[in-house]
């Protein structure tokens, strides 16, 4: 009876509050929802009513509840989700479960093989059990691909409005966008200057990058820079070194860009499709390759007469300012300290280091380094009888120090060359063929027969060269630019010969 009496009282109160507006039975449910929303909204700190989708997102506790309609259409948010798929958390997955597809439906990685929706906070375990049954493996992959849509909560918007497919593809149907992005990457890479990695001519031959192709790309970049009057000061500063231009051109063609233009930041390059970051200090750089190249072309030192008339061969390898400073500091250090920094054994402070030398060598040692007696000297790794061999003033020790300087001056020689294609992740559109095929099947781009079985960077190269040929002006500066390209490739070949020798 109490329940039946509350109904008329509630209806009467609503009618008293809203008057003739509530008398329509069609408007009553909507007004009740508005009354309920007005009681819930102040808890979120607002005073205006919100729509139903925003209410569900706030109840779910998503920190981006108000931006949920824009999250699926935001390219920046899309690649933020892609960046969470690191190699440690997401490895060994087929192409249909690539991070680009998972991020398309709002998923991020929180643990190894564990996905989480960025909106409804639902979890999805995407582990693939090792099995020798290929049929079961394909079934599990198909199940996980279907779960990318079905594993969301009931009111989540991702299954109905995922991110556009074009976010995970290269804009092959928009040459203007390709050229603009190509130019931006090129300019950012030129800021690294001599810190750019050295490229191996064998890799360029494998990529079918000929001298004419690089020359045409450099000419295209030069033409595009002429259309940007505001960037002329920057381009005049960036266009001083041909080696830097050619290397930056090849890297930007393969999708690489400088991570940060701050001078204090580390030399990092990034692919903004697979979000891979590569530190250039692990590869041979242009600066070190140029010094090795100049050394291989006859810039070696003549023998310097050493102690007792023996010649000492100190390498005269062209050095960077930092190495020149290090070499000058090494020249002022006494032989005793040189011996201490070479030996891996424990250091023992001894004030009678001159006792191990012969009486004939003692005056020469004291004249060469008066402070050697107070320097710490390393203990020899053998018995005390071999102390005479480890004398700092002996010619043998000075020759070893020369070899140490030689190895330190060419410390980048064992570093590998940078391969602009193999450094991408295997699902990256720049090196992946599948996504380029999907571009044709979906009809979003109209690329004829240029990319039926080509990686993304090669499709971009074909489009850029076609655009350059279609807009080819009269023969003005093409010959001079072609000469620049041939000069750069001669330098590439010289680097290869110097590194192999």
UniProtKB/Swiss-Prot annotation:
Pfam families: NuBaID_C (PF08600), zf-C3HC (PF07967). It comes from the Eukaryota. Phosphorylated. May also be weakly phosphorylated on Tyr residues. GO terms for cellular component: nuclear membrane; nuclear pore nuclear basket; nucleoplasm; nucleus. GO terms for molecular function: protein kinase binding; zinc ion binding. The modification N-acetylalanine is found at residue 2. Keywords: Acetylation, Cell cycle, Cell division, Metal-binding, Mitosis, Nucleus, Phosphoprotein, Ubl conjugation pathway, Zinc, Zinc-finger. A motif (Nuclear localization signal) lies at residues 395-401. The modification Phosphoserine is found at residues 24, 58, 62, 68, 320, 328, 334, 337, 343, 353, 358, 369, 380, 394, 406, 482. GO terms for biological process: cell division; protein ubiquitination. A zinc finger (C3HC-type) spans 102-156. Its main location: nucleus. Residues 54-72, 326-338, 350-359, 369-383 have a biased composition (Polar residues). Residues 21-73, 302-421 are annotated as: Disordered. It is found in: Nucleus; Nucleus envelope. The modification Phosphothreonine is found at residues 28, 84, 332, 383. Required for proper positioning of a substantial amount of TPR at the nuclear basket (NB) through interaction with TPR. PANTHER family: NUCLEAR-INTERACTING PARTNER OF ALK, ZINC FINGER C3HC-TYPE PROTEIN 1. Interacts with TPR; this interaction mediates ZC3HC1 nuclear envelopes (NE)-association but also required for proper positioning of a substantial amount of TPR at the nuclear basket (NB). This is Zinc finger C3HC-type protein 1. The lineage of its organism: Eukaryota, Metazoa, Chordata, Craniata, Vertebrata.
């Amino acid at each position: 009876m109490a329940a039946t009496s509350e109904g008329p009282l509630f209806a009467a109160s609503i009618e008293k509050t809203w008057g003739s507006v509530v008398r329509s039975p069609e408007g009553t449910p909507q007004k009740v929802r508005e009354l309920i929303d007005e009681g819930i909204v102040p808890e979120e700190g607002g005073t205006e009513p919100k729509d139903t989708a925003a209410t569900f997102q706030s109840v779910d506790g998503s920190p981006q509840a108000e931006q949920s309609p824009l999250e699926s259409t935001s390219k920046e948010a899309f690649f933020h989700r892609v960046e969470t798929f690191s190699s440690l958390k997401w490895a060994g997955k087929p192409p249909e479960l690539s991070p680009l597809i998972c991020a398309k439906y709002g998923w991020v990685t929180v643990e190894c093989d564990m996905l989480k929706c960025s909106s409804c906070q639902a979890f999805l375990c995407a582990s693939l059990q090792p099995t020798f049954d290929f049929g079961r493996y394909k079934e599990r992959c198909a199940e996980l691909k279907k779960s990318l849509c079905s594993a969301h909560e009931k009111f989540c918007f991702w299954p109905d409005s995922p991110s556009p497919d074009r976010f995970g593809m290269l804009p092959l149907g928009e040459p203007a966008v390709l050229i603009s992005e190509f130019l931006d990457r090129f300019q950012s890479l030129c800021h690294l200057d001599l810190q750019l990695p050295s490229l191996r001519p064998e890799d360029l031959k494998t990529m079918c990058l000929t001298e004419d192709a690089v020359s045409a790309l450099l000419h295209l970049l030069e033409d595009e820079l002429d259309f940007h009057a505001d960037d002329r000061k920057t381009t005049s500063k960036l266009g001083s070194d041909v080696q830097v231009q050619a290397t930056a051109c090849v890297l930007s063609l393969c999708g690489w860009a400088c991570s940060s233009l701050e001078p204090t930041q580390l030399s990092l390059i990034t692919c903004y499709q697979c979000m891979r970051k590569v530190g250039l200090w692990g590869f041979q750089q242009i600066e070190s390759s140029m010094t090795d190249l100049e050394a291989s072309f006859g810039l070696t030192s003549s023998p310097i007469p050493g102690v007792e008339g023996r010649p000492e061969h100190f390498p005269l390898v062209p050095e960077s300012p930092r190495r020149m400073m290090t070499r000058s500091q090494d020249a002022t250090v006494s032989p005793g300290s040189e011996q201490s920094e070479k030996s891996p054994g424990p250091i023992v402070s001894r004030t009678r280091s001159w006792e191990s030398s012969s009486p004939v060598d003692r005056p020469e040692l004291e004249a060469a380094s008066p402070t050697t007696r107070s320097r710490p000297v390393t203990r020899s790794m053998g018995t005390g009888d071999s102390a005479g061999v480890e004398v700092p003033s002996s010619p043998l020790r000075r020759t070893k120090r020369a070899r140490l300087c030689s190895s330190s001056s060419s410390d980048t020689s064992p570093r590998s060359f940078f391969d602009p294609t193999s450094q991408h992740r295997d699902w990256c559109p720049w090196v992946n063929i599948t996504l380029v095929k999907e571009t044709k099947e979906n009809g979003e781009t109209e690329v004829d027969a240029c990319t039926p079985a080509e990686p993304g960077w090669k499709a971009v190269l074909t489009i850029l060269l076609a655009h350059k040929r279609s807009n080819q002006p009269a023969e003005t500066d093409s010959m001079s630019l072609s000469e620049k390209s041939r000069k750069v490739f001669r330098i590439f070949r010289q680097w290869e010969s110097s590194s192999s020798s």
